[in-house]
Amino acid sequence: VLLVIDTNVLLSGLLWRGPPHALLGKARDGAVDLALSAVLIEELLEVIARPKFADILARTSRTPKRILDELRVFVDVVAAPPLPRPICRDPDDDAVLACALAARADLIVSGDDDLRALGMFEGIPIVSAAEALIRLG
């Protein structure tokens, strides 16, 4: 099963426990495949460098570069051309959809209300991290 995980779920899984963390564990263990695009990785690095994450990074002795190095071990980076037309209000959400389409993902995992409201994109279900875990068994 190939997943594309949005930046907020990815960040949550990297920094805290819970369903997003469990999904990343499945990817680390090879139970699922995880794909990201360069645009999504860039967004992750931009978000994680924000001052509000400095404390948790310091407490866990991690840097944005170290997190990226950790991800490179179990994430496939795909070339994801932009969508031909906008789907969502937020261009960052369209980047998730473009990545899923390019990767031929089986599931899009997101906590974003706009993405989740779509329910499905080009035949790819859009689900929460908890729902993804249920589907994966």
Task: Kindly give the residue locations of the regions a language model identified.
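Acidic, PIN/NYN-like endoribonuclease modules and their adjacent C-terminal/linker elements
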Residues: 101-109, 113-137
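Active-site neighborhoods of divalent-metal-dependent phosphate/nucleic-acid chemistry enzymes
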Residues: 73-107
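Short, flexible loop segments at the rims of nucleotide/cofactor-binding pockets, characterized by
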Residues: 11-13, 57, 83-89
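A secondary-structure boundary/capping signal
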Residues: 6-7, 36-37, 111-112, 129
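Residues at secondary-structure transition points
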Residues: 18, 35, 58, 62, ...
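Short, well-structured N-terminal submotif of metal-dependent ribonuclease cores
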Residues: 1-36
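PIN-domain endoribonuclease scaffold, especially VapC-family toxins
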Residues: 28-83
